[in-house]
Amino acid sequence: MRFFYYLVFIVAGSVFVGCHPSANSRGEVTGVRQRAFRATVPYGMVYIPGGSFLMGPVDQDITFAQVEDNKQVTIAPFFMDETELSNSKYHQFVNWVRDSIAITKYLNDPKYYVHPKGAAAPKNGKKYIDWAFVAKNPPWVNKKGATNNTNKLQSMFYQGDDRVFDRDEIDVRLLKYKYDEMSLRDASDYQGDLTKKRSDFIRHDTVSVYPDTLVWLHNFTYAANEPMTHGYFSHPSYQNYPVVGVTWRQAKAFTIWRTRFYEHYRQSRHLPSDREQYDLPTEAQFEYAARGGRIGANYPWGGPYIKNAKGCLLANFKPGRGNYSDDGATYTVAVRSYFPNDYGLYNMAGNVAEWTASAYDAAASSFVNDLAPTFNYNAKASDPEIMKRKVVRGGSWKDVGWFLQNSSRTYEYQDTAKAYIGFRCVTAFEGRDIRDKH
């Protein structure tokens, strides 16, 4: 009987070993076979091939700052939004935050949550919103026969003396997005320190997501911009115009949400993650993409002039003293206006200036690396104001032509919003070239 059990053990062990993925490797290291991968371009983005370029000014330094040096640098391939982020897309973020808060803090209705069972049930006890159900049954719309949510959601509207004409308007101060982010740079600074835990490098932040619509007034004193304050973010005529009035922290929060939004979709379809996280472009990525592969070009369209042969202005900016409209618009224009550059990117110069991921230092070019250069600093609320400066690129509808140059750089503080600053996202390409077969 003992021999029988021993024989069964050997047979079972043989079956176990025979089923191992390396059973046919004949003792050689053959690697772990993974699924075939074919890179796809994310929706609304274009592929920017990697390459080397001379970063910095190609024209005279009219500011006489004498701190802008040229530097030959190399950029890895990446994907970039072909346009500035529109009001419509940012509205999707705001609405997601609004609905999340309504469901989790005010309704507490089980039908808005998924109810997985068995192994699929979350082990941390957290509840997850069933967004497919929410899309068909919005908490703000009372369909025939549906439970009336008006009373439960009343606290999300302005109350008492804050109401105007007794209208139900969302109190936008409640719309805050809370997120966690692993800081790889912080972790790398403590390399080999065994006293640190992973949680020491996870940063937590809570950001108000609604744009500051009053920027149209406090950015331009003694100007009648009330119509832009009332309608720019809310009126459907502006849905395809670039979002403005967002701080750097709000733009960063959007990139985190966009990453999570895509990952949750993949998880809901039981698909593996196939994309790097979204982020703001570094200033080197922005300049490289703006040049469109052209060498020594002043502007994204390649030529040294801001007008074409017919005398038409090639971007939305301020062409003369007190003159904002000769380019075809008084304020901003739709995100697909004017011709794209050779990479297919719209408005890399003009329309709205854009936040980058890079912190600002006047002499950054003298100390950043020549491979994927950037200067990053995660400023805290307690840090001096000078540490909260972020690089702004591209020039805007209210700027003169010099700011439209590919190499022109300026800055704003990360917690300030402007009527002329927006943003677009990037995500890294994993591999050497999109044409490679994996």
Q: Residue spans of the language-model regions?
A:
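Bacterial Sec-dependent N-terminal signal peptides
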Residues: 1-29, 289
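Short capping motifs at secondary-structure boundaries
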Residues: 78, 85, 94-103, 255-268
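Non-catalytic, alpha-helical, charged scaffold/linker segments
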Residues: 105-197
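Post-signal peptide N-terminal segment of mature Sec-exported envelope proteins
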Residues: 26-54
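Short proline/glycine-enriched turn/loop segments at secondary-structure junctions
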Residues: 379-383, 410-417
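Short, structured beta-strand segments at or near domain termini in extracellular proteins/domains
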Residues: 419-435
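Functional-site microenvironments in short loops/helix caps that host divalent-cation chemistry
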Residues: 20-26, 47-48, 54, 59, ...
